């Protein structure tokens, strides 16, 4: 049985880890980095770049370089959060036929799971290169506050990448696993404050040890799936744009190239200000107008940055208060605070968290790697390699159905431990009603329309009866991934209807299968592209070598002998510019065949060989000697 890898599919960066013996290990990617930027680029040559290579070319290809796709996954195009991103992202966000938020690339619409699958494929390949064997199974993490549609979309991304997703686990829970696995005995209640690139979560987790078995029980969770480092970056970018407009009278928001340069510079400045008090944002030739080129040079202090983002940090503390109240705990009952996510490196975040909890956060957890490590531990648990660890997670949002008057009736309260199952009996609203529509909702509001609609289905064939008489039993079943299954049964006729919630949007199985086939086709195309590049390199090498020999010994050949060689060189050069690998290989062989006389001319002549042999005798000790240490006996 192969290894089950752990993947932290992040908004800004992703990370992969695996159990190496009895210890989790973060795996370096092909570039030698322990984290990979969650950036995907589609080039003019139809090549797909992922990670650092995609990030490097973003400035010259802003419309086809996609980042922060996790903020769109499982969302509707009309969602308020998506509409905010539409106006600031350099790439195109479009409405899919089913109303989901998709991305437009080179005139084609692409689903977020399809794009995220490219990052997962990179993580899969990174693990395979390290392990030296195929990887087909993974535990993938999601923000604790992800709803059902977002969890389903993440699982879809795994399928498209060729991975069987053995478990979806919440990021703060994974971080708690990473933190608590090697800690000493005793019970602890910890708060995991997870502020990543695009999402924020706060989970209260109790770690108990009984008879050598560690139990990680999530008491409550809360968060904001549209609050993270990207929002901090956007505050910096908007400040720089506004300052530049004041100074130069030019609005850079209409220039995608300039905005991409500003995004990189803004992120860099934000990171620098975690250790420095001041930084210079210097972007020469950022744009030009009738008066000539314009340069951006703006000083940014830590104090200014903090004033720009202070409300975002304060906003993160609201879910903290709710999670504590839901767990029935006070701040003083929290033993340790764990910071996860790159944005928690900001001093202001650390100060606010310390002030709120009245204790300094732990520094012994790597905020970029803890989540992937925890996912790898859970993979080890599922594979049977890690014993004595029990994980009890919760559903982040209440679940229910719409009942008469447009009210949401809750069946499963938020923060219920999963897996779980709950049934409740409902009835008809009208006399002789023969069918009921079960409208499944997720959220905390009383009015049905104010909650997230997860889908609906009909139960038909109800026997005619006065209103309130038929008994319709509705059952909610949430599995360990947090995925919801709903059934409705008429107790009078025993007729039953079941569905696994596929959000009223989301990808169909056919669409996912097509994307899997596309991904496999792309893998074949990538292999062919690699072979073509190798053939071109061989051709270039041969052309260069032949030209060099022609310049050195070409005068020893007749014009009749040289002409076919020069023609074969020209033919090979022309073929190497094309896309036909077989044609290049044919021309390579043709050049090798006509170059025989040139090779002979390049061989040392007998007299030269004799001279070389003579000189070789006198230098035999130099050529053949082995180095050995000579000790000086004085």
Swiss-Prot record:
It holds the Pfam family HSP70. Keywords: ATP-binding, Chaperone, Nucleotide-binding, Phosphoprotein, Stress response. It comes from the Bacteria. Residues 600-614 have a biased composition (Low complexity). Coiled coil: none annotated. The modification Phosphothreonine is found at residue 199. CDD domains: ASKHA_NBD_HSP70_DnaK-like. Residues 599-634 are annotated as: Disordered. Induction: By stress conditions e.g. heat shock. Belongs to the heat shock protein 70 family. PANTHER family: HEAT SHOCK PROTEIN 70KDA. Acts as a chaperone. NCBIfam families: PRK00290.1, PRK05183.1, prok_dnaK. HAMAP family: DnaK. This is Chaperone protein DnaK. It comes from Pasteurella multocida (strain Pm70). The lineage of its organism: Bacteria, Pseudomonadati, Pseudomonadota, Gammaproteobacteria, Pasteurellales. The gene is dnaK.
């Amino acid at each position: 049985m192969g290894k089950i890898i752990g993947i932290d599919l992040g908004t800004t960066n992703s990370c992969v880890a695996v159990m190496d013996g009895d210890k989790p290990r973060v795996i370096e990617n092909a570039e030698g980095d322990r984290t990979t930027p969650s950036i995907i680029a589609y080039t003019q040559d139809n090549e797909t770049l992922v990670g650092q290579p995609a990030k490097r070319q973003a400035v010259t290809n802003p419309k086809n370089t996609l980042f922060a796709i996790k903020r769109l996954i499982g969302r509707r195009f009309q969602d308020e959060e998506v509409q905010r991103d539409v106006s600031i992202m350099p790439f195109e966000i479009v409405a899919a036929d089913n109303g989901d938020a998709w991305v437009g690339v080179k005139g084609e619409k692409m689903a977020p799971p399809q794009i995220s699958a490219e990052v997962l494929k990179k993580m899969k390949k990174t693990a395979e290169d390290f392990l030296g064997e195929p990887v087909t199974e993974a535990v993938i993490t999601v923000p604790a506050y992800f709803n059902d549609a977002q969890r389903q979309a993440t699982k879809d991304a795994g399928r498209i990448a060729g991975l069987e997703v053995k478990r979806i686990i919440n990021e703060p829970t994974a971080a708690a696993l990473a933190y608590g696995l090697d800690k000493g005995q005793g019970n602890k209640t910890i708060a995991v404050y997870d502020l990543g690139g695009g999402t924020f979560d706060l989970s209260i987790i109790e770690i108990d040890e009984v008879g050598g078995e560690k139990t990680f029980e999530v008491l409550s969770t809360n968060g904001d799936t549209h609050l993270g480092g990207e929002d901090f970056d956007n505050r910096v970018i908007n400040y720089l744009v506004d300052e530049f407009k004041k100074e130069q009278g030019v609005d850079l928001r209409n220039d995608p190239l300039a905005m991409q340069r500003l995004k990189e510079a803004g992120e860099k400045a934000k990171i620098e200000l975690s250790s420095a008090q001041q930084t210079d944002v210097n972007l020469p030739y950022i744009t030009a107008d009738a008066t000539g080129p314009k340069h951006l040079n703006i000083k940014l202090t830590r104090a200014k940055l903090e004033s720009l983002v202070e409300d975002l940090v304060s906003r993160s503390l609201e879910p903290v208060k709710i999670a504590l109240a839901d767990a029935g705990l006070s701040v003083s009952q929290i033993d340790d605070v764990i910071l996860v996510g790159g944005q928690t490196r900001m001093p202001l975040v650390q100060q606010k968290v310390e002030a709120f909890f009245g204790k300094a956060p732990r520094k012994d957890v790597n905020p970029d790697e803890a989540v992937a490590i925890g996912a790898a531990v859970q993979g080890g648990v599922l594979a049977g390699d890690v014993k004595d660890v029990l994980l009890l997670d919760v559903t982040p949002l209440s679940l229910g159905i719409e009942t008469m008057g447009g009210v949401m009736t809750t069946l499963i309260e938020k923060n219920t431990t999963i897996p779980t199952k709950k049934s409740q009996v409902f009835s008809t609203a009208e006399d002789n009603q023969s069918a009921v529509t079960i409208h499944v909702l997720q959220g905390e509001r009383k009015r049905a329309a104010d909650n997230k609609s997860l889908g609906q289905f009909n139960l038909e064939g109800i026997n005619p009866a006065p209103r309130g008489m038929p008994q319709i039993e509705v059952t909610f079943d949430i599995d360990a991934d947090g995925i919801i299954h709903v059934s409705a049964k008429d107790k009078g006729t025993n007729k039953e209807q079941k569905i696994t919630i596929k959000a009223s949007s989301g990808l169909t199985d056919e669409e996912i299968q097509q994307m899997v086939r596309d991904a496999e086709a792309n893998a074949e195309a990538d292999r062919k592209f690699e072979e073509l590049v190798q053939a071109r390199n061989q051709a270039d090498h041969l052309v260069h070598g032949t030209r060099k020999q022609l310049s050195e010994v070409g005068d020893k050949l007749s014009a009749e002998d040289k002409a076919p060689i020069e023609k074969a060189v020209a033919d090979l050069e022309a073929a190497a510019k094309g896309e036909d690998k077989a044609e290049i290989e044919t021309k390579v062989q043709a050049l090798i065949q006509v170059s025989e006389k040139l090779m002979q001319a390049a061989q040392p002549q007998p007299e030269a060989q004799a001279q070389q042999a003579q000189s070789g005798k006198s230098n035999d000790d130099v050529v053949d000697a082995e180095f050995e240490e000579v000790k000086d006996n004085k």
